[in-house]
Amino acid sequence: MATVGEWSCARCTFLNPAGQRQCSICEAPRHKPDLDQILRLSVEEQKWPCARCTFRNFLGKEACEVCGFTPEPVPGAPLLPIINGVLPKPPTILVEPKGSGKEEAGPVRTAGLVATEPARGRPEGEEEREERGEEEEKEQEGEGERAEPGSGWACQRCTLHNTPVASSCSACGGPRKLSLPRIPPEALVVPEVVAPTGFHVVPAPSQPVLPGEGAEADSPSTSQGPTSTDQEPPRVPLFSPFSPTLQNNPVPRSRREVPPQLQPPVPEAVQSSASTSSKGPQQGPGRAAAGASRLAELLSGKELLPGKRLSVLEEEVPESSPARCESCSDVIDLAGDIVRYTPASPSSPDFTTWSCARCTLRNPTTAPRCSVCGGSKLHGFQEHSEPPTHCPDCGANKPGPCVGSCGRAPSAHKAVRLLPDRPGQWACPACTLINTPRAKHCAACHTPQLLVTQCRGATPLRRRESMHVEKRRQTDEGEAKALWENIVAFCRENSVNFVDDSFPPGPASVGFPVGDSVQQRVKQWLRPHEINCSVFRDHGTPWSVFHTLRPSDILQGLLGNCWFLSALAVLAERPDLVERVMVTRSLCAEGAYQVRLCKDGTWTTVLVDDMLPCDEAGFLLFSQAQRKQLWVALIEKALAKLHGSYFALQAGRAIEGLATLTGAPCESLALQVSSTNPREEPVDTDLIWAKMLSSKEAGFLMGASCGGGNMKVDDAAYESLGLRPRHAYSVLDVRDVQGSRLLRLRNPWGRFSWNGSWSDEWPHWPGHLRAELMPHGSSEGVFWMEYSDFIRYFDSVDICKVHSDWQEARVQGCFPSTAGGPVGVTALTVLERASLEFALFQEGSRRSDSVDSHLLDLCILVFRATFGTGGRLSLGRLLAHSKRAVKKFVNCDVMLEPGEYAVVCCAFNHWNPAPPGPPAQASSPSAGVPRGAPEPPGHVLAVYSSRLVMVEPVEAQPTTLADAIILLTESRGERHEGREGMTCYYLTHGWAGLIVVVENRHPKSYLHVQCDCTDSFNVVSTRGSLRTQDSVPPLHRQVLVILSQLEGNAGFSITHRLAHRKAAQAFLSDWTASRGTHSPPLTPDVAGLHGPRPL
């Protein structure tokens, strides 16, 4: 047990005293090496260190800039640069021995100098010494660190060249001399080395030159200098599989990777011949004999390259004789703490074979795949300078994008296949080695095969947390600004202005028909400094994105998009919200702007240019802002780009504009009873007033639609009261003063105010209320109105619930066109009691080029849920739901306790079942027109919560949709007891159609039910027919039919007649011509929804 103050060594776990800075056993430093410092050294400029003061000077300096020391260069040898903190080794040059009367070691190999005999006249015992490689460094350590003051030493861990006086490495802290226990060479495992991405690869050292091959013997008078050669070593690509540079990087290995079975250590008496080095003429006979043996090997063609340094454990290893690989016969020399690996033919790489990148087996060049693991040759042998000529998907031998069988362009981020191509083989998840089917453990890292089976059967985790609204906005803006800065930098470098090629300035972006007057008036697209200002007083005002924006700044153009401008005016009551929409908030000289909008429930940052449609005189034709502000025109152009054209922005409701601009949940409160469906529930004016009061206290945005929708409007009567029909107003304040319910409204136009009761000029104002409600007098376009008049002349109130401190999560899905498709359900996990808002958006509902652009009957259902074994979903009690409506989006809100919930999104008026037999009759304006789209329509479920929640899209059972509809109808529908043991449930009012569910509680009798809805109009049936006959088994219930409103703008009518009888058999007998139990038959397209379900 460690005492107080002792510290454990991170390398050998030895307990050292508190005052000890290095480990007493392995001399490792107490603190871990600074990785940042090592990385900085790896990219340091090429410099040479001063031998006197250790200052690092640039290569061009002949003397030290600090102390003035001038190194003595070797004649004819250039000063070696230090690259990446490592002193590179010059080419090894072999020189034939001169003189026969002196005892010499023959040709020897050094790392920085050609070793020759001493110069004549020099005292015996002196010799020229230079910095040499690992062999000399090893020898210096064994001889008591005998090094000259200016030589220095190379760190054996990180190869940094250190000063002679340093006792430990200045980069990694490694000791100069190691004192670790010896480990036999058999315990060392050398893995395959791959160069790390992003690091510079030092070119490989030159190959040795044999005597007689370009290196001639020097005369005695010139033997003092280094010998030069004219032969150029063979060039190997830096990142080639055969590059020795990539294969000679030191790779540290942990101790746990040493195999458990070790052979007896080699006796220290056996010395490696490769570790011999020249020490001059004072070498003994033993070294001379070793040198002679070395020379014989070189002359016989068995030359050795400078050993590559693969230090796998920082421990001293006893020297042993060189061994050879059993597979390729390459020389593997274990000496000291160094493992030298020498290929059999390093100077001439073998291009007749290629190494498999998966299992490292060498295959013949003619083989396209590995004979063992089936790995592709392209991944194991390919020059990096040549682009790939094979398609990764179809294998076509064509350069560039594939236009053959697959027709796909190569992806920049291709997923790596970790699973083997051949059946039975398995890839280790730890080291990716391909193993044989019989192997229970990985041959490299001993990972069990059971782990692979578990990983293969696991499904990817799709559960995610909700994100804070403000954090999401900041994240989106950060990503968008990075793109914007690149575009602006490119435009500045090339002196051009940005032009958006995805929404070009042309007729297609305007989008109106060819003969339309609006299309003909667009003559040119101009930038702000080229546009003529229509207001004379604004001529001297410079252009800007914002200039103290006001709602009255908005001016509508030729487009019929007042729904969007009304929402923009409501948003302008809070200038900070408008600034959040504009990501680029200042004028851009290059003309690139970004706008953040929420289209169909999904946040999108839109990039646009500042080229705006103008007439021949240079005046703007579409929406604009006064005082030369660009925010209105840029937001409108971004919205037009999202939906395809300016033409697509025509017609809409202000609530859609609020949802697009804010991304917040929006709710519309109807003030009038629907004229298309008089049987709708009556309007509760007290409930609406309470909601408006609470919304004002919460700081929500509110807008009101005047004289539109379901109302019959007399334009003259409205204008006489100062109102503008089919126009949106902003609700500024809601007050309950002395029993009077008052609202303060603003006309975005800044003119035309209400002149009825409680108006500015109304003579019956109480004095104290006038001073309280209008302290600054009247202003143009702003007025007070009594709530009863508001109900009479306005159609609806739109509430935008902007929460700056809420969480949000958005889940994409699709509406299946039949019950046979997958039923998407969103699993919701509530961690603490929270208030939640749900909004369901239909994707692509505004685009005019969509194949199936009609609106769907959207509905949201929220249930308690339980997940059984295997994640099987079971629905519980219905907690909340939206009304089923043919709109662009619907919403609902609920307060939930901690637990598991399921959110079901459904729509039915796009179903196109094809029952067998003759075509079924459809009572709808578009009968006979195929409505089925190639792909099911998509949707986005937006979840807003006051606390953190978890959402996860899950795939439910095919019968989950039937269970959800049955629970909804039983909970909210009308109950009718037709006979004993039979109950019918109807859901019609406020549900954009009809849902009929029948329950048979008889234990033995069948229930035959016939439902006739042939007199209905503008509805479509999920059964493909308006007349159905079904046999409900005992103790079962069934969804007989779902009728859905087809066209949202047109009225619909539903008439249904129900006939039922008890029967002892399941067949319908005389009700159908065939012996069937359902008519139309329950095909797989509808069985999941309309099949009988047990009670």
Swiss-Prot record:
Bias kind Low complexity: ranges: 280-292
Modification sites for Phosphoserine: S311, S345, S348, S1079
UniProt keyword list: Hydrolase, Metal-binding, Phosphoprotein, Protease, Repeat, Thiol protease, Zinc, Zinc-finger
Residue stretches making up the Calpain catalytic domain: 497-803
Tissue distribution of the protein: Highly expressed in the brain and eye during development. Expressed in olfactory bulbs (at protein level).
Gene that this sequence comes from: Capn15
EC main group: hydrolase
Zinc finger regions, RanBP2-type: 3-32, 44-73, 148-178, 348-379, 422-451
Name the UniProt record assigns to this protein: Calpain-15
Segments of this protein annotated with the region Disordered: 96-153, 204-292, 1074-1095
Family under the similarity heading: Belongs to the peptidase C2 family.
CDD domains cross-referenced by the UniProt entry: CysPc
InterPro entries, per the entry: Calpain_cysteine_protease, Papain-like_cys_pep_sf, Pept_cys_AS, Peptidase_C2_calpain_cat, Znf_RanBP2, Znf_RanBP2_sf
Species in which this protein is naturally found: Mus musculus
Catalytic residues (positions): C562, H727, N747
PROSITE patterns reported for this sequence: CALPAIN_CAT, THIOL_PROTEASE_CYS, ZF_RANBP2_1, ZF_RANBP2_2
EC number(s) on file: 3.4.22.-
GO molecular function terms attached to this record: calcium-dependent cysteine-type endopeptidase activity; zinc ion binding
